[in-house]
Amino acid sequence: MRLSTIKEWVDKNLQGDRVIWAVVFALSLISILVVYSSIGTLAYKRSSSTESYLLKHTFTVFLGLAAMWVAHKIDYRYYSKVLRLALWVSVPLLLYTFKFGNNWHDAARTITLPIINTSFRPSDLASLALIINLASMLSKKQQNIDDIKEALIPVLIWCGVICGLIALTNLSTAILLFATCMLIMFIGRMPVKYLAMLVLVGLLSGAAALKFGTRGTTALNRITAFINNDELPFQAKHGRIAVATGGFIGKGPGNSEQRNILPNPYDDFVYAIVIEEYGMIGGIVVLVLYLILLHRGMKAAYNSERAFGGLLSAGLSFDLVCQAMVNMGVVVGLGPITGQPLPLISMGGTAMVFTGLSVGIILSVSRGEQEENWGQTSAAKEVVSEEKDLEAKAA
């Protein structure tokens, strides 16, 4: 196959920011390698084989990539219409999860989808829907952003309801989503006094979640344990051991020792396995990949000609990379345990699909701006060509 044919196929099928594509492919490869290394104990406990879990995870990774590809082919402006309904659907789903959800990490965070018998986290759908709809609402109210009734009240209601319901079972996810909402509102030129009101709504929602939710006591205990190093939790202790023993170049692929001790080495502590097996070099590479993803997402936001595209790309990029930073910070001892997975790397089902959708939408924004810039450049070239023809005829 000739290089020109390959380039033509890539240009046709992998549109948008090519750097983002490269970063996602690199993180997906790292995910397959590290998860395969860390699922031995899980397979043994469930009387299964590591190969079966490897195939399942690899399928999930490709499913996420497929979701990303489909999402990047769709004009990002359509998402505000489709996911407006998803925002309304998220409310009863979150309430149902709180009352009848499956236990995951000692909390009711998932529900089982009928027919396909797969666990699903409604908070993933709710987070994506809120970010998209918040970006849409603010982009439409740019001319009257100071209007309390038109611009502020809808934002306060939706942020308070969605973040509050998520906080009932997953406080850390609610806090990250709330921070993302604050960023979108700040970029969307929301007045500072209104941002202060949003903070007040967030504090009230958080207080209600601590009182009535299932994770209030756990969250306070984890914060206390983080402050008092003499009460270091089991996971945090062995996560730091993995980091400390990894050294500069690591123990090599498949040679982790803490993978057999950590309760979830393939999930929220997968970064510990990355450092233990690939050393400080591997840890830095993963960190840099996420920073590149953030930079390219923010660049797409900056280059966007439409307010909706800019707010959308900025919000999704920040939410995804902030989650990654929290996960890595917990592993190296910079924060209390949160249970947050490492996006695009941790083993997961529908979470991988929703992450793929988020990245695909970012790519859709970058693709749209590239096409507009290309169209403007082509139009300018045509004008210049016509002017030259006229000059030639006049001469």
Indicate where each model-derived feature is located.
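Membrane-interface helix-loop-helix junctions at transmembrane boundaries of multi-pass membrane enzymes
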Residues: 144-152, 194, 298-318, 374
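Hydrophobic alpha-helical segments of polytopic membrane proteins
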Residues: 84-85, 90-91, 148-167, 171-211
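Transmembrane alpha-helix boundary/anchor motif
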Residues: 66, 74, 133, 207, ...
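Loop-to-helix entry and N-terminal half of a specific, functionally important transmembrane alpha helix
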Residues: 301-339, 345
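Hydrophobic, glycine- and aromatic-enriched re-entrant/interface helices and adjoining loop segments
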Residues: 104, 108-110, 196-286, 305-312
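Hydrophobic alpha-helical transmembrane segments
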Residues: 59-67, 277-294
